[in-house]
A protein has these predicted regions:
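Acidic catalytic loop of the alpha/beta-hydrolase fold
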Residues: 89-90, 118
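N-terminal beta1-alpha1-beta2 submodule of the flavodoxin-like/Rossmannoid cofactor-binding fold
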Residues: 1-80, 90-92, 97, 101, ...
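Short, glycine-/small-residue-rich phosphate/pyrophosphate-handling segment
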Residues: 111-148
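Glycine-rich, N-terminal phosphate-binding loop of Rossmann-like dinucleotide-binding domains
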Residues: 85-86
Length: 162
């Protein structure tokens, strides 16, 4: 794998996905980019038990696209882009769709990774594929919750034949 052409882009509200992204980037010597919303999420926004919380409202509208704080990911410089996020309502938060729709991922390999308190990827990859150009290769990665060593992460990346 050409490590100089790899980016780990991630969205994290509580720090769990940030830690996973940083560990992955360190293990494969990749650059890191944080996907940030223009309006940061508050703890109240993330209350999944409240049907009127910001995250609940956004996730109940599959066409909703939260604005990004910036579009400085320099996608053109990378061949492989890991995209990480927490699983919300069994799929990726809609800000991931915003990110994927905001750049030209043509000819890129996109490898998903996620963190989750209990659910798996579900239909995440299929839902995100719709936000990518047809010639972008989307790979459903794995959950990177806790306990993966740098060697485990490198082995996983090597198994992807990037």
């Amino acid at each position: 794998m050409d490590m100089n052409k790899t980016l780990v882009a991630y969205f994290s509200c509580t720090g769990t996905t940030r830690r996973a992204a940083q560990a992955l980037a360190a293990a494969v010597d990749a650059d890191v980019y944080e996907i940030r919303p223009q309006i940061p999420y508050t703890p109240a926004d993330l209350d999944w038990r409240n049907k009127k919380s910001r995250s609940s409202v956004e996730m109940n509208d599959p066409d909703f696209r939260p604005a990004l704080a910036d579009k400085n990911a320099a996608i053109d410089a990378y061949n492989t882009i890991f995209v990480g996020f927490p699983i919300w309502w069994y799929v990726a938060p809609t800000i991931i769709n915003t990110f994927l729709e905001s750049g030209d991922f043509s000819g890129k390999k996109i490898v998903l990774f996620a963190t989750s308190g209990g659910s798996g990827f579900g239909k995440t990859a299929a839902a995100l594929k719709k936000s990518l150009s047809p010639d972008a290769a989307l790979v459903e990665g794995k959950l990177l919750n806790t306990g993966l060593s740098p060697a485990d992460l490198r082995a996983w990346c090597q198994s992807l034949a990037l």
